[in-house]
Curated annotation (Swiss-Prot):
Disordered: annotated span: 1-34, 599-620
Protein name: Dynein regulatory complex protein 1 homolog
Gene Ontology cellular component list: axonemal dynein complex; axoneme
Coiled coil: 175-332, 395-416, 715-742
TM region positions: none
């Protein structure tokens, strides 16, 4: 314990010394950085600087010294119970422990290899952030200085214009106007220089991004190679340790067999040798028991006499203790009386303490009142904070629109990057195919002495479509609920604008019933507090939303919209006179299932609308509704409340689809700007795999097989040479042993 405390004190002193040295050796501020390479050189210089790593090196050296000293103490210390148990372990257990230790070291080494790559990436990212921060600060300072100087020049020019108004001489006025033009030209030139500097910074950042991406790809390749190599190493190590464990088990089994044979042989020899001795011992034991029995009888008689005398003395002693017990009982009764009086006094003290506790409880109630008042104040402040946060939310909504425009620009940038990567891969594959053809031509002309011809003509590039930019204002119009200019409604009902009052009475009656069902089913949208407030009013006064507002919310402005709404709701209606039991649960389930299937298919296909399925569901229900309407002429149609919101959802989705569909021939406003499908891309890149026919592959495989066979022959030759050397060494050792035995 004393050694450990001394080591901890020395470690703390070393850490404190390191911190003092770090405070004393403060590095000067970084100056302006010219490029990313110079910044990396400076960072590496700081990292490998001896002054920066002085405290860290001291800590490492101190830690290693302490670790070596503790290990030396463990080696020199006498063996304890654990070491003796370790020495007594079987060879199998020792082999298992040794194998587990070595395999754990291999696994730990593999983890370190993988961790080194991650640490290098994190270090590179740290350097990049430091450099980008420095560059950003420099550019910001430069822009601020330029704006200050520009404003000063502008104020100077503005002041000179007032002086020009007072000048009456034409030549002097002309000279001063020319000077003003020169000053303005200088300001514009400085602005152009700043713009070019900013553009150069943007180009540098793009180049740095490409460089970092290539370096990251190299790190990933290195990491994959390390992992594969470590996996193969672990496989070989596990196989070797399993083989060694099998050999150890076989040796242990042979040792156990030899020990068992030797044990049984010695046992039978000892049993045959000691048989006569056991008979003699039995006769001697019988004589000894006879003598012992006689001695026990004599000693028992003497013990009985002594016990009688001892019991008489014990009886006299118990009588004396009985007298003493009576005296103690009298003393205890007097003590009980005294304790009773003491308890009465304590009871009086407890009454006083209870009164004090009651007063304390009263003070606590007062504290609770103060706490409640504080809670009320907190509630009011919370309301104010909620209002402030609501305003922040509105600001965030405006920021969302900006982010959408930025996202659109990012998609355009991704399209450009896709084109660049496509062009790079296309060029690399063409170069690779040319190299393969060149090698194949050399093989045919030089090795096989055969004429060579190109098997496949060159593959044309399919990614040559022009990029078209989408209009960002369309998304803003859709967000605020305005129909964009390039969205058109169907041409069927553009010119007709009849009034809703021209509807037949049946349609008006059905619409009134539908709106009532909607209001009944929308009760969950209203708070219970509002229902309690409206409870004392009449049914007409409870109406908070009028039909005009509902139609305005649903974008129903013409008679065709009302007819469309009626068509959507007709499949879910029934006649209460002809069908008093209402719609069957089976039909309701069919409605939900048929409407949910298109939605699931849309989600699986990536959100693309399926017009045919919506059309099919509408067509299946419309004939039934028309038949029911003809059969139940002038009947009062009703609707299930459970299907009301479902039908309204179908109507809104249908209207939204009509309002926001594109013009014929226009490109969809999709997120993906790449006009080539995945199948076309796969087919295009698969064409390169067919550039080299199967006959050429067989020829190359045949050559490879011959070379591999030659390599295997060389390996076998090396193995045979090693075996010959080993056998010669064994023969020399055996010859040496035979010479010793002959001597």
């Amino acid at each position: 314990m004393d050694d450990n405390e001394d080591e901890l004190e020395e470690h703390q002193e070393l850490v404190s010394d390191g911190s003092v040295e770090e405070e004393e050796e403060v590095e000067p501020d970084l100056g302006p950085v010219d490029s990313w390479e110079s910044f990396n050189d400076r960072i590496d210089g700081l990292i490998f600087n001896e002054r920066c790593d002085k405290s860290v090196k001291k800590l490492d050296e101190r830690r290693l010294a302490i670790l070596n000293r503790v290990r030396q103490q463990f080696r020199e210390a006498p063996k304890g119970v654990a070491e003796r148990c370790q020495a007594q372990k079987s060879p199998i257990d020792q082999r298992l422990e040794l194998s587990s230790e070595r395999l754990n070291e291999l696994v730990r080494f593999g983890k370190e290899l993988v961790t080194n790559v991650r640490v290098a990436n994190e270090r590179r990212e740290l350097n990049r952030r430091l450099f980008e921060g420095a560059q950003k600060n420099q550019m910001h300072v430069k822009l601020q200085r330029e704006s200050v100087e520009t404003m000063a020049r502008f104020e100077n020019i503005k002041a000179r214009w007032t002086e020009l108004e007072e000048t009456n001489e034409p030549m002097l006025l002309w000279d001063q106007i020319e000077e003003q033009k020169k000053r303005i030209a200088e300001i514009m030139a400085r602005k152009d220089e700043m713009i070019s500097a900013c553009q150069a910074e943007v180009d540098r950042m793009n180049a740095k991004y490409e460089f970092d991406r290539e370096r990251q790809a190299q790190d990933l390749c290195c990491l994959v190679e390390r992992v594969d190599h470590q996996v193969e190493t672990l496989k070989e190590a596990y196989k070797e340790h399993i083989q060694m464990l099998r050999q150890t088990i076989e040796e242990e089994r042979q040792i156990f067999a030899d020990n068992a044979v030797e044990k049984w042989r010695t046992f039978f020899d000892a049993m045959n040798a000691n048989f006569d001795e056991k008979a003699n011992l039995v006769r001697a034991r019988e004589q000894f028991y006879a003598r012992q029995t006689q001695q026990i009888n004599e000693s028992q008689e003497e013990l009985t006499k002594s016990t009688r005398i001892r019991l008489e003395k014990e009886c006299e002693r118990l009588e004396l203790e009985l007298r003493r017990t009576r005296d103690n009982v009298l003393m205890n009764s007097e003590k009980l009386d005294y304790n009773y009086q003491v308890l009465q006094k304590r009871n009086e003290e407890n009454v006083i303490i209870n009164n004090q506790q009651k007063r304390r409880v009263a003070r606590l109630h007062e504290a609770i009142g103060r706490t409640r008042r504080g809670l009320k104040n907190l509630y009011n402040t919370g309301k104010r904070n909620i209002a402030r946060l609501s305003s922040d939310i509105y600001k965030l909504h405006s920021n969302i629109n900006d982010m959408e425009s930025k996202a659109h620009q990012a998609r355009l940038n991704n399209r450009e990057k896709f084109d660049r990567i496509w062009e790079i891969n296309y060029k690399e594959l063409n170069l690779l195919v040319d190299r393969v053809y060149h090698i194949d031509r050399i093989i045919h002309e030089q090795q096989l002495a055969m004429p060579w011809s190109s098997p496949v003509p060159p593959i044309p590039n399919i990614n040559k479509a022009k990029k078209k930019r989408n209009n960002i204002l369309e998304k803003f119009d859709m967000r605020i609920g305005r129909v964009p200019k390039n969205r058109v409604m169907p041409n069927s009902g553009v010119n007709c604008k009849p009034d809703i009052k021209e509807l037949p009475p049946d349609s008006l009656r059905l619409m009134r019933n539908l709106i009532r069902k909607l209001s009944d089913r929308g009760g969950f949208l209203i708070e219970e507090r509002l229902l309690k407030i409206l409870e004392p009013y009449s049914e007409e006064e409870k109406c908070l939303v009028r039909i005009d507002n509902i139609f305005a919310a649903l974008r129903i402005r013409h008679l065709r919209d009302v007819k469309e709404l009626t068509k959507v709701f007709m499949p879910y209606t029934y006649c209460p006179n002809c069908q008093p039991q209402g719609l069957s649960p089976r039909k309701c389930a069919e409605v939900f299932m048929k409407d949910q299937k298109p939605n699931r298919l849309q989600g699986a296909a990536g959100g693309q609308p399926d017009e045919k399925e919506h059309r099919s569901t509408g067509d299946t229900f419309l004939p039934k509704s028309e038949v029911a309407a003809k059969r139940c002429h002038n009947h009062y149609l009703v609707m299930e409340p459970a299907l009301c919101l479902h039908a309204m959802n179908l109507f809104t989705s249908k209207m939204h689809k009509k309002m926001y569909e594109h013009e014929p021939g226009s490109i969809l406003n999709a997120v993906n700007l790449i006009q080539i499908t995945d199948a076309e891309i796969r087919n295009f890149w698969r064409q390169f795999s067919a550039c080299f026919p199967a006959s050429k592959c067989k020829l190359w495989k045949t050559l490879e097989h011959g070379l591999n066979h030659y390599v295997e022959v060389l390996k076998m030759r090396v193995q045979y040479d090693a075996e010959v050397v080993f056998l010669r060494r064994q023969n020399e050792e055996l010859r040496h042993l035979l010479q010793k035995f002959t001597v």
